[in-house]
Regions:
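Core segments of cupin and vicinal oxygen chelate
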Residues: 1-42
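N-terminal beta-strand motif that seeds the catalytic metal site of vicinal oxygen chelate
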Residues: 1-8, 62-67, 116-117
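Short amphipathic alpha-helices within nucleic acid-binding modules
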Residues: 12, 72-78
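Vicinal oxygen chelate
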Residues: 22-25, 35, 76-117
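Short, charged/polar surface micro-motifs in flexible loops or helix N-caps
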Residues: 40-43, 52-54, 72
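Short, charged/polar, Gly/Pro-enriched secondary-structure boundary elements
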Residues: 41-45, 107-110
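Acetyl-CoA-dependent GNAT
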Residues: 49-51, 114-115
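Short glycine-enriched loop/turn motifs at secondary-structure junctions
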Residues: 57-62, 93-94
Length: 117
């Protein structure tokens, strides 16, 4: 994911969503890369900052990331305390799952999913 403010974005994924920094790398062309992952997962998200490129503008509804949470109501309250209120939801799906969305830095949207009991 291209970002304009790498450290602010890394801080959000670490401090707000609880992801961990797996590694940092600077490419030969100067791109700064930070790989983050959820605990106990091999899946990684690559955050990329290109210092000599124009500012990134994320198109609305272009993409989003989704994370499963155990207790959406509790997690939403914690997010609100940190300055990230829900932007949509919570909504119960036909399957019984509950979903909600927050706006992350850089214009990306994060979906939170509490699976049906």
């Amino acid at each position: 994911m291209r970002v304009n403010d790498l450290e602010r974005t890394v801080k959000f994924y670490q401090d707000v969503l609880g992801l961990k920094v797996v590694r940092r790398h600077t490419s030969p062309r100067g791109a700064q890369l930070v790989f983050v992952a959820t605990p106990n997962s091999d899946e990684e998200i690559e955050l990329t900052y290109l210092p000599n490129s124009p500012s990134v503008q994320v198109q609305p509804d272009l993409m989003h990331l989704a994370f499963e949470v155990d207790d959406l109501e509790k997690f939403a309250a914690e997010l609100k305390q940190q300055g990230y209120p829900l932007s949509d939801g919570p909504t119960r799906t036909d399957s019984g799952a509950v979903i909600a969305f927050i706006d992350a830095p850089e214009g990306y949207e994060i979906e939170l999913i509490q699976k049906a009991p």
